A protein has these predicted regions:
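N-terminal cofactor/phosphate-binding cores enriched in small/glycine residues
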Residues: 12, 22-23, 35
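A structural motif corresponding to the C-terminal end of an alpha-helix
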Residues: 21-28, 217-218
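A conserved short coil-to-beta-strand element within the FAD-binding core of flavoproteins
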Residues: 31-45
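Short beta-strand to alpha-helix junction loop
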Residues: 8-17
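Secondary-structure transition/hinge residues
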Residues: 26, 37, 256-260
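Short, small-residue-biased leader/transition segments that mark boundaries at the very start
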Residues: 1-7
Length: 288
């Protein structure tokens, strides 16, 4: 209590361990496939997906959209929100001495105007970032030691849910009646001149309500991650990994319960969601 701790992990090892857990649970992983059309059925959804050399039709009861920009929500024609101005993306890389790898520090390059709307805008952001990094490598005469595969995007489309989390909700640590997970990060809006995080006051722990994860007017779909229903400043804090993990676990539990009980995510009793989350060792919001 009263101290801060940063836990660093290996993104590469984490991804392999996550794959292992999914496969142990019977999940069929389908990399490189994307939904192209969705049809609502009497019992849920028909989802047509396509990848290179593959086509697949998935019949399911519930959808969890974790695409970052609410791409599935957009395919359904449900309302999404995005401002004209976007935070810069970041491209992570290392340049240094290959004979002294400890001397090379991870660097972050701002990619201004980075837009994750579609494949063409993502391609443009990646080309822009890599061009600048190549220029730095040439000028420094150092070795490029590491390069992330693509630009990291901070901001994209957000859904509009029955609850829109405001920055006041976030910074005051409002406990929503339908809270399903926690967040913790400072308000962290990046601009062309940099970023000045606004830390939360000691003891303030924001919550994420279920109603901010369900698109308004929808049925049998829930989201998790950066596309949560929130204003821009609140979203700048909610978009980070730990908060997204909590949302994902809550959304998955809600979707599973909805499928098992032949109901919709918004109709699942909150105590059932909390109970299932606790079974899987999630940290469940409680009123102080």
């Amino acid at each position: 209590v009263g101290s801060e701790m940063c836990i660093r992990d290996s993104q590469f090892l984490y991804s392999i361990l996550a794959e292992e857990k999914c496969q142990e649970a019977g999940v069929e992983i389908a990399y490189y496939e994307f939904p192209t059309a969705l049809t609502q059925t009497e019992n849920g959804w028909q989802v047509d997906c396509m990848g290179f050399g593959t086509k697949r039709r998935v019949i399911c009861k519930q959808i969890v959209d974790c695409t970052g920009g609410a791409e599935v929500v957009g395919l359904l024609g449900l309302e999404r929100l995005r401002g004209e101005e976007r935070q810069p993306g970041s491209y992570l890389f290392k340049i240094g001495d290959p004979h002294n790898p400890a001397s090379s520090q991870l660097r972050r390059l701002y990619v201004h105007g980075a837009d994750s709307t579609n494949s063409r805008t993502v391609t443009l952001a990646n080309l822009t970032g890599r061009k600048t990094i190549l220029s730095r490598v040439r000028n420094s005469k150092e070795r490029l030691m590491h390069l992330q595969p693509e630009t990291g995007f901070r901001e994209s489309f957000r859904i509009i849910g029955d609850t829109v989390i405001t920055v006041q909700d976030y910074t005051s640590g409002r406990h929503f009646e339908d809270a399903v997970s926690y967040a913790f990060y400072p308000v962290d809006l990046h601009t062309r001149t940099g970023v000045k995080p606004k830390p939360l006051k000691r003891g303030i722990v924001p919550t994420v309500p279920l109603s901010s994860l369900i698109p308004k007017g929808s049925k049998n779909i829930i989201v998790a991650g950066r596309c949560i229903s929130s204003d821009r400043l609140a979203n700048s804090a909610l978009r980070v990994q730990a908060a997204c993990m909590g949302m994902g676990q809550a959304a998955g539990a809600t979707a599973a319960l909805a499928a098992q009980n032949k109901t919709t995510p918004s109709s699942v009793p909150l105590d059932k969601i909390h109970g299932l989350l606790r079974e899987h060792n999630a940290i469940v919001p409680e009123k102080s």
